[in-house]
Amino acid sequence: MAHDLASYVGSIPECYDRYRATDFEPFAEDLADRVASAAPCGSVLELACGTGILTVRLRARLPFSVRIVATDLNPPMLEYAQTKLGGMPGIEWQQADAVTLPFPSGSFDAVACQFGFMFVPDKAAAFLEARRVLARGGLLAFNVWDRLQENQSMRVVQQTISSFLGREPGFFAAPFGLHDRSLLHDLVQSNGFQQIEISTVSIRTVSPSARWLATGIVTGSPASLELQQGGIAPEPVIEAAAAALARAFGDCPCETDRSAVVVTARAP
């Protein structure tokens, strides 16, 4: 991550996992299914594992004989995942930077990444590294968020935070900045992949309440660091965001549509 506004530190990992899992779990199920339905493999490398939301689903969907190595650049996220899932057998944990992976060439049959490539400053290097560590014919499977306009709950909270900061929060540029299908195709193809397939997955996610969702987005992302740096307490922002979300999507539960772009490709 380039700077601390893209870092998941302090209480962010816990809030991210507690409040935002409902946003990520359906997409994790989809991605794990794609990995599991591919040709049989003996090893999977997960990049940007975060708090282990995809990791759990990969372990559940793949035979126990399949080796799973879960990595993340941010130590607090990796430590949280290890604490939460440390008792789950068949998972290896390792800190790793996606642009300089500490693994031999051709050592994995699949590389999976949920909502991580958007945050990598040198995306070409990350895809090149993914290609390097894949065996011949290995699978690359990842998702990224669709544009912000297709994820209206996030847009509502972004606008609320903007009203407090007096400007757009910088954090939101990264998660929703890699949705262009042509750019994705070119990035993947130019770094050695073939058989590229790109699709859109839209899922309705359900949060217990609008306040629950607002709390997750405000406190479970580096946007909270921007508020802190601006001397703004999170509670008034959460209250305002919850009210806006309830008006737009209802309350108890709060149902919102989320959209992601999913890419699969093969190493030659």
Predicted regions and their residues:
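A structural alpha-helix within SAM-dependent methyltransferase catalytic domains
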Residues: 32, 56-59, 127-131, 158
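Conserved catalytic/acceptor-binding region of the Class I
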Residues: 124-125, 131, 135-208, 224-230
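Conserved alpha-helix/loop element of class I SAM-dependent methyltransferases that forms part
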Residues: 22-41, 57
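Class I SAM-dependent methyltransferase SAM/SAH-binding core
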Residues: 43-101, 125
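N-terminal, positively charged/glycine-rich alpha-helical extensions of SAM-dependent methyltransferases
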Residues: 1-14
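A short acidic, Gly/Pro-enriched loop at the edge of an enzyme's catalytic core
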Residues: 99-111
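A short SAM/SAH-binding and catalytic strip from SAM-dependent methyltransferases
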Residues: 109-123, 146
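Conserved Class I S-adenosyl-L-methionine
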Residues: 3-6, 23, 51-53, 177-268
